Amino acid sequence: MYKILKMEGRAKRAHMETVHGNIETPVFMNVGTAAAIKGAVSTEDLQQIGTQVELSNTYHLHVRPGDEVVKKMGGLHKFMVWDKPILTDSGGFQVFSLAGLRKIKEEGVYFHSHVDGRKIFMGPEESMQIQSNLASTSRWLSTSAVECGRAPLCAELCRPHGEMAAAMQK
């Protein structure tokens, strides 16, 4: 359930209920790219500072340790020893951050792993399957093959990727 508690202009304060706990927005999400928060922060530390939700990265977890490994271990919550909400992204940011290691096609993105050089294909279905294996609380599909660009962006660069993302949502 998602309930807007207050609005002011375009800003919203909301309450979201998930199977792994509630989230009050706006919220700061700790980023555990590879299912761990950097800097020797323990689960107890995160609980103590009031962390409501953690964000992990679909692409990086697919590459290492592997989404099948996480699935065999019972999903991200057991793998991380974290009982609160976990959001996984689509892997789309890597289209930007690993620009030298990828090729965008209509059906998705072809990557060369930054770890071992193997070829990895990630389209909408693959992204959702990986996220299903990870068993996160909430899964994003919206950026599967969208190229993030640096400002200022030109319409000629952005339009084709926006159209591709819209087509993938159908």
Regions flagged by a language model, labelled:
Residues 1-169:
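Non-catalytic, usually N-terminal nucleic-acid engagement modules in DNA/RNA processing proteins
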